C-alpha cells in the first residue's frame, strides 16, 4: 500500500510540474527571450491586418509566391494543425505528391521535373509552415514576374532582401517568409 501511495504522489507531482510549472517556465522564457515576446507577429498592409508571419497562408494567384502545401484542415487551419500521417511509401501520399508536382510544373513550365523543390510538393509536420527555402522562392521568380508584368531581376532582388539568415548565424537555415515576401511585392507595386 505504501508503494501505491508513493506512486500516486509522484504521479500527481509530475502532472502538476509538467502541466503547470514547465509550461509556465517556457512561456516566461518566450516572453523574455523570444522574438515578438512569444506572441504572433501580426502583418499589416495599408493599415489592415492581413495575417500572422508565423502561421502560413494559402496563396494561389500567379502574382504571389506560394508556400508549402498544408494538411491542416482546409488549408492552413490553425485549429487542425497536423501532418497527413501518411508515410513516404503510402500509395495515396505518393499520388498526392505526383499531382502536386504536375500542378507545380503547369504553372512553372520552364522547370524540369527534377528541379521542383521537394518542400513545394510536401506538407510540413505542422501543416502551418510560413517559410520556404530561398531555392523554393527563386524557382517561382519568373512566374511571379510575368504575372505582375515586372522585370525578373527586380523580383529576384525582392527575394534577396526577404531571405532571413539563421538565428545567431547558426540555428536553423536560411528561409523566406512567404507572407512578408508577398507584402513586399504589394508595397513595391503601391509606390
From Swiss-Prot:
Coiled-coil regions listed in the entry: none
Broad class of where this protein is predominantly found: membrane
Superkingdom of origin organism: Bacteria
Gene Ontology molecular function, alphabetical: ATP binding; P-type potassium transmembrane transporter activity
Pfam families: KdpC
Cell membrane found in the keyword field: yes
Membrane-topology descriptor: Single-pass membrane protein
Localization annotation: Cell inner membrane
Keyword Kinase tagged: no
GO CC terms in record: plasma membrane
NCBIfam families named in the record: kdpC, PRK00315.1, PRK14002.1
Family: Belongs to the KdpC family.
Function: Part of the high-affinity ATP-driven potassium transport (or Kdp) system, which catalyzes the hydrolysis of ATP coupled with the electrogenic transport of potassium into the cytoplasm. This subunit acts as a catalytic chaperone that increases the ATP-binding affinity of the ATP-hydrolyzing subunit KdpB by the formation of a transient KdpB/KdpC/ATP ternary complex.
Protein name: Potassium-transporting ATPase KdpC subunit
Native species: Bacteroides fragilis (strain YCH46)
Upper classification of the organism: Bacteria, Pseudomonadati, Bacteroidota, Bacteroidia, Bacteroidales
Gene this chain is encoded by: kdpC
Amino acid at each position: 500500500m505504501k508503494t501505491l501511495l508513493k506512486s500516486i504522489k509522484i504521479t500527481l507531482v509530475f502532472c502538476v510540474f509538467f502541466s503547470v510549472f514547465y509550461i509556465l517556465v517556457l512561456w516566461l522564457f518566450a516572453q523574455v527571450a523570444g522574438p515578438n515576446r512569444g506572441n504572433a507577429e501580426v502583418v499589416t498592409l495599408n493599415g489592415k491586418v492581413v495575417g500572422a508571419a508565423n502561421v502560413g497562408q494559402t496563396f494561389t494567384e500567379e502574382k504571389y509566391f506560394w508556400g508549402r502545401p498544408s494538411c491542416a484542415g482546409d488549408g492552413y487551419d490553425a485549429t487542425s494543425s497536423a501532418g497527413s500521417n501518411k508515410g513516404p511509401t503510402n500509395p495515396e501520399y505518393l499520388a498526392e505528391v505526383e499531382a502536386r508536382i504536375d500542378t507545380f510544373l503547369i504553372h512553372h513550365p520552364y522547370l524540369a521535373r527534377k528541379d521542383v523543390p521537394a518542400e513545394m510538393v510536401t506538407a510540413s509536420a505542422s501543416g502551418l509552415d510560413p517559410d520556404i527555402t530561398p531555392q523554393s522562392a527563386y524557382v517561382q521568380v519568373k512566374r511571379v514576374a510575368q504575372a505582375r508584368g515586372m522585370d525578373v531581376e527586380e523580383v529576384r532582388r525582392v527575394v534577396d532582401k526577404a531571405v532571413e539568415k539563421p538565428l545567431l548565424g547558426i540555428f536553423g537555415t536560411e528561409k523566406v517568409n512567404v507572407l512578408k515576401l508577398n507584402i513586399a511585392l504589394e508595397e513595391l507595386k503601391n509606390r
